[in-house]
Curated annotation (Swiss-Prot):
Gene3D superfamilies from the UniProt entry: Rhodopsin 7-helix transmembrane proteins
Taxonomic lineage from the root: Eukaryota, Metazoa, Chordata, Craniata, Vertebrata
An MF annotation (GO) of this entry: melanocyte-stimulating hormone receptor activity
InterPro entries the UniProt entry points to: GPCR_Rhodpsn, GPCR_Rhodpsn_7TM, Melcrt_ACTH_rcpt, MSH_rcpt
Subcellular location(s) of the protein: Cell membrane
Gene source species: Presbytis comata
CDD domains: 7tmA_MC1R
Residue pairs linked by disulfide bridges in the UniProt entry: none
Similarity section: Belongs to the G-protein coupled receptor 1 family.
Protein name: Melanocyte-stimulating hormone receptor
Subunit structure comment from the entry: Interacts with MGRN1, but does not undergo MGRN1-mediated ubiquitination; this interaction competes with GNAS-binding and thus inhibits agonist-induced cAMP production. Interacts with OPN3; the interaction results in a decrease in MC1R-mediated cAMP signaling and ultimately a decrease in melanin production in melanocytes.
Membrane protein topology class: Multi-pass membrane protein
Key words, A-Z: Cell membrane, G-protein coupled receptor, Glycoprotein, Lipoprotein, Membrane, Palmitate, Receptor, Transducer, Transmembrane, Transmembrane helix
Amino acid sequence: MPVQGSQRRLLGSLNSTPTATPKLGLAANQTGAQCLEVSIPDGLFLSLGLVSLVENVLVVAAIARNRNLHSPMYCFICCLALSDLLVSGSNMLETAVILLLEAGALAARAAVVQQLDNVIDVITCSSMLSSLCFLGAIAMDRYISIFYALRYHSIVTLPRARGVVAAIWVASILFSTLFIAYYDHVAVLLCLVVFFLAMLVLMAVLYVHMLARACQHAQGIAQLHKRQRPAHQGVGLKGAATLTILLGIFFLCWGPFFLHLTLIVLCPQHPTCSCIFKNFNLFLALIICNAIIDPLIYAFRSQELRRTLKKVLLCSW
């Protein structure tokens, strides 16, 4: 992840400097301005990561176990869970290494720590990119299933889904490696921000279009059965509420992180922006919260998956 300054948090922990850069974030503001800084304890950070890790491991295990779930839709959901798993796991690993370095329980040279930091950054960045891509893929899959229902199984085949999955993983790893290598270039930050905005617009357009189709369908059924308008309005309100929750969670969890990147480009030295930079760990914690919420939205709502999950848990005992 892009940072401002010559040190990242792992190196700062190794050198035991009091002004070490927060995890993958920006250096503290030295202007003396009063800032609202939300501190995220390492224990809370590890706890959030552990919850996300367990949830997403269960999703992957359930989908892998049940052959009925080996469909394109669940393929994308499984890969989303795997991406979220890597996001949480990489941040837990970094936090654990930092704690060990600060406690003196782990001895390592600066060069080794730098390489480890680079590897963790690549894993974190690639898993974030792939997570966003799979959210878009799930939205596209649902869109095709609604608007091209009769041709869905000929359009979205398992081999094509696997090809999309492979392309997303390869592209995520490639671009994340380039982003980490050239993190101090403005173009890199702009590319990340544009990518986030593109995914946000794509998801909003697709889900709004699906909501409109659902309302039209409900209206047609109401007219067919000569029902009153409240039934149609109820469907519209329920769909709008679901859409607001889905896109709202996406924006609230991912938006601050990309706002952080945008401000690095627009006002890297401004005191107000520097105050926002201090809360980078909070923004990262929000992304991990999104990794906790994703299984609840996309996976655990499936009865088939829940039944398989119960079998997985019973077998583990």
